[in-house]
Amino acid sequence: MGCTLSAEERAAMERSKAIEKNLKEDGMQAAKDIKLLLLGAGESGKSTIVKQMKIIHEGGFTSEDTKQYKPVVYSNTIQSLVAIIRAMGTLSIPFGDNERESDAKMVLDVIARMEDTEPFSEELLAAMKRLWVDSGVQECLGRANEYQLNDSAKYFLDDLDRLGAKDYMPTEQDILRTRVKTTGIVEVHFSFKNLNFKLFDVGGQRSERKKWIHCFEDVTAIIFCVAMSEYDQVLHEDETTNRMQESLKLFDSICNNKWFTETSIILFLNKKDLFEEKIKKSPLTICFPEYTGKQMYQEASAYIQAQFEAKNKSSAKEIYCHQTCATDTNNIQFVFDAVTDVIIANNLRGCGLY
């Protein structure tokens, strides 16, 4: 008997080849679809990373986007000044000049009338400028770890003339510095290095965490953000819990979660610029009493990194760590390039191609 295949067998073989080809193509397509989950405690810089992806991979902000950030800049600026004024009462810090009391009243009235998103009137701008240079206000700014203050407070308040100009339009840096609490889930899509990225930013505050869970399926990698500069601060939601200790606890639960046994974990030790300034003045022992090293950036940041890496209970899992400044576009572009290379290598390994 010959070895010729019957028409049926030939058809079955063709079908099998076609299925195999489709599976391979599907596999390659799946390897090109990258789902990234941005996690981390509140105010660790996740939303700023999302804005950077828009700048780096989506051509930046349109003039319409820019206009929409104007009221946010006004509100962030005046709310920051009010936070300092209120903290002066709590910390018993008097104004350097008693005449500032009436300026403070004017600023507080704007908030009471919910007009904080409006452009500053000339009168209000002058009052804010006088308050900002007051010695008591500056003393209170120096104790910002003792109350809740936006990181961008100094950035905006140092630039009141520009923000108060009639023709003011937010710059890219202004937009990166704005702060709006993320509620729900923000999703961004972009392509880079022949890959299709879907990036999810999930609300960081404790009350938002239960909303994360349905994002967890088939995640390629997690970018976990930590604000290094928050080692001497407490949470908004619970003013007895140290922010970095909370981050460590959250990282532990994410890193060792059953959902993420196969997931690459990338750790962004963020706000390195603020940390570099703060570590000279505020001891790391506030968060880590056992720390005996120097109050210097290299040694202190390496210690923080080691604390996070020590939470990883799996010898098979590698934590990819980067020290970042989310408001610095060049830094984030460089880091994200490195992150993408890790994802590509891990993906190829998963497909048996590396």
Swiss-Prot record:
GO MF annotation terms: G protein-coupled receptor binding; G-protein beta/gamma-subunit complex binding; GTP binding; GTPase activity; metal ion binding
An annotated GO BP: adenylate cyclase-modulating G protein-coupled receptor signaling pathway
Region G3 motif, residue ranges: 197-206
Region (G2 motif) location: 174-182
Record-linked InterPro entries: Gprotein_alpha_I, Gprotein_alpha_su, GproteinA_insert, P-loop_NTPase
Sequence segments annotated as region (G1 motif): 35-48
Binding residues for Mg(2+): S47, T182
Subunit structure: G proteins are composed of 3 units; alpha, beta and gamma. The alpha chain contains the guanine nucleotide binding site.
Name this protein carries in UniProt: Guanine nucleotide-binding protein G(o) subunit alpha
Gene source species: Planorbella trivolvis
